[in-house]
């Protein structure tokens, strides 16, 4: 889409140019991005996954607001990864209320992140990214058996990752 002056529009704030990893199904990632340290961690993990090309981050608020183009992004995704920072699971609830039932779910509290007591550090972001990748790999390895499960036990998927 071009602007009236003939130049392409600048990307939206927070937009990424990530592309699916070749040979892997397109994954869209949604983070709760809540106001706590755990929400900030979820957001930073999703952004890092998007920059690395492991998934494409999309707007969770747009799902909640039923913005047609953003809902269409979720509908077209071959898979969805939801990252929640705390046990309230706002991101999971938002997707379910919008009619999405099948997605992978990383709950940061299950890997030792405690809302209000885990300041955002690069180490914690890296642990979260590895946990997300472990979940995505686990689903890839078992996709013919489990055929896209609704939820994965993220604690089991990251047994080898040290928690905080």
Regions flagged by a language model, labelled:
Residues 1-59, 69, 74-79, 89-164:
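Iron-sulfur (Fe-S) cluster-binding modules
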Residues 60-63, 83-85:
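Short His-Asn-centered micro-motif
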Residues 66:
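S-adenosyl-L-methionine/SAH cofactor-binding core of RNA-modifying enzymes
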